[in-house]
């Protein structure tokens, strides 16, 4: 799988129990969405390898999963902190103007005056709206992801234009 063909959807945490189950930190919303994908790509020892999901259940704030051929805690331990990805084509199509968070991470953020504010490091879900975490060398900014604040997103040019004061 080429880097652009996959989307990171979570991370394997630590072993859970004695039968090879593993805790998972999900990057999806809701967190159990990643259980909808029967085969995961796991980045193990810097190589992507497919692993089949045998079972999974919600154990908040984590998921716990049983993956094929991982049958004991010692084997499960070797997968600690490995990234979980799926093929991009497994994601549903989005409506015009909607974006997957993963596509926004790494984009440059500039305000409407052309001042560079940094790059999108991550997103935070809050009760009222999502928030872009924008990092530069100097600071971190939390910019609301609202129709007023976000003026445009250009995935090809890798840029987000925001209505945001550079001093905030």
From Swiss-Prot:
InterPro entries: PRC_barrel-like_sf, PRC_RimM, RimM, RimM_N, RimM_N_sf, Transl_B-barrel_sf. One of its GO terms (molecular function) is ribosome binding. GO terms for biological process: ribosomal small subunit biogenesis; rRNA processing. It comes from the Bacteria. GO terms for cellular component: cytoplasm; ribosome. SUPFAM superfamilies: PRC-barrel domain, Translation proteins. It is found in: Cytoplasm. Keywords: Chaperone, Cytoplasm, Ribosome biogenesis, rRNA processing. Residues 96-168 form the PRC barrel domain. The PRC barrel domain binds ribosomal protein uS19. An accessory protein needed during the final step in the assembly of 30S ribosomal subunit, possibly for assembly of the head region. Essential for efficient processing of 16S rRNA. May be needed both before and after RbfA during the maturation of 16S rRNA. It has affinity for free ribosomal 30S subunits but not for 70S ribosomes. Binds ribosomal protein uS19. Belongs to the RimM family. This is Ribosome maturation factor RimM. It comes from Coxiella burnetii (strain RSA 331 / Henzerling II). The lineage of its organism: Bacteria, Pseudomonadati, Pseudomonadota, Gammaproteobacteria, Legionellales. The gene is rimM.
